[in-house]
Every structure is written in structure tokens, then in C-alpha cells.
Amino acid sequence: MISFDLIVEDDSWAALGDLEALCRKAFDAAEYVAPVEEGNIALLLADNHVLHQLNLDFRSKDKPTDVLSFPSLPMDRPFLGDIAVAWGVSASDAKIQGKPLDAHLVHLLIHGYLHLLGFDHETDDEAAEMEALEIKALASLDIANPYRND
């Protein structure tokens, strides 16, 4: 079972209500499609500034991003790693895509979790595998396929 330590550094996230329950729902769905015996995740819900700095420091990209994942080393298990999510980028993307922000956050957390387990989307085949898992996890929560353009 996945446990997580939630750190909220931007008060804007409070608009989503019970963040612990929302994150629990996301990680339960993620674990449904990619189970682990046990694992702990450090989860940071922050602002664009924090994600911008992390993106610059660790990916040499000088801009904010929606979500970043930092897998732990195998010897550090059961700690799976860190996930950080930016309020501004996430809220803007959800609005542009016409999605509820809570559903978008759930998707980002599932996406981040899969990265912690080693899934990636650098190639078309990797992307197809990862997206299929995300779609299945989201469907278990009655959240629409985020990759379908209707």
C-alpha cells in the first residue's frame, strides 16, 4: 500500500477541499494499475515559482511545469520518491482543457506515480504504455480519458 506525506506550500490548493482524500484516491487508482507491495511518496503541492526552480535545477528547463517526479534509488525503498505539482500551471491547463481541476490533479498524481516506478514517455511505445495505464486508473474513478480530443 502507498503512503504519502503531503506538504502544501501554496494556499490556492485549499480550493480543492480535502486534499488528503483526493490524493489518497489518486494513489489508490495508480496502485490499482501498477501495484507495489509498499511505498512512501513525498508529495509537494506548490506554486509555479517552486516548480520553475526545480525544473531549472534538475532538467535545465527555464520555465514552470505542471508536475515533476524524482524517483528514489532502489536501495532507498520503500521510499518511492518525490512528486511536486504547480498550482498555476495545473489550474491553467485544466481550464484550457475544460477539465475539473480535481480530476486534472488526480491525473497528474497518477502520471507522477508511474514515473516513480520507472515508466516514461520518451518513445512512442513508452508513451502508449504509460498513457494506457493512466487511462485505466482514471477510468476506475470515472474520470474521462485525458488524451482523447472530443
From Swiss-Prot:
<dbReference type="GO" id="GO:0006364">
    <property type="term" value="P:rRNA processing"/>
</dbReference>
<keyword id="KW-0690">Ribosome biogenesis</keyword>
<dbReference type="InterPro" id="IPR023091">
    <property type="entry name" value="MetalPrtase_cat_dom_sf_prd"/>
</dbReference>
<dbReference type="GO" id="GO:0008270">
    <property type="term" value="F:zinc ion binding"/>
</dbReference>
<keyword id="KW-0255">Endonuclease</keyword>
<feature type="binding site">
    <location>
        <position position="121"/>
    </location>
    <ligand>
        <name>Zn(2+)</name>
    </ligand>
</feature>
<dbReference type="InterPro" id="IPR002036">
    <property type="entry name" value="YbeY"/>
</dbReference>
<dbReference type="GO" id="GO:0004222">
    <property type="term" value="F:metalloendopeptidase activity"/>
</dbReference>
<keyword id="KW-0540">Nuclease</keyword>
<dbReference type="Pfam" id="PF02130">
    <property type="entry name" value="YbeY"/>
</dbReference>
<keyword id="KW-0378">Hydrolase</keyword>
<comment type="similarity">
    <text>Belongs to the endoribonuclease YbeY family.</text>
</comment>
<keyword id="KW-0479">Metal-binding</keyword>
<feature type="binding site">
    <location>
        <position position="115"/>
    </location>
    <ligand>
        <name>Zn(2+)</name>
    </ligand>
</feature>
<keyword id="KW-0862">Zinc</keyword>
<feature type="binding site">
    <location>
        <position position="111"/>
    </location>
    <ligand>
        <name>Zn(2+)</name>
    </ligand>
</feature>
<keyword id="KW-0698">rRNA processing</keyword>
<dbReference type="GO" id="GO:0005737">
    <property type="term" value="C:cytoplasm"/>
</dbReference>
<keyword id="KW-0963">Cytoplasm</keyword>
<dbReference type="InterPro" id="IPR020549">
    <property type="entry name" value="YbeY_CS"/>
</dbReference>
<dbReference type="GO" id="GO:0004521">
    <property type="term" value="F:RNA endonuclease activity"/>
</dbReference>
<protein>
    <recommendedName>
        <fullName>Endoribonuclease YbeY</fullName>
        <ecNumber>3.1.-.-</ecNumber>
    </recommendedName>
</protein>
<comment type="function">
    <text>Single strand-specific metallo-endoribonuclease involved in late-stage 70S ribosome quality control and in maturation of the 3' terminus of the 16S rRNA.</text>
</comment>
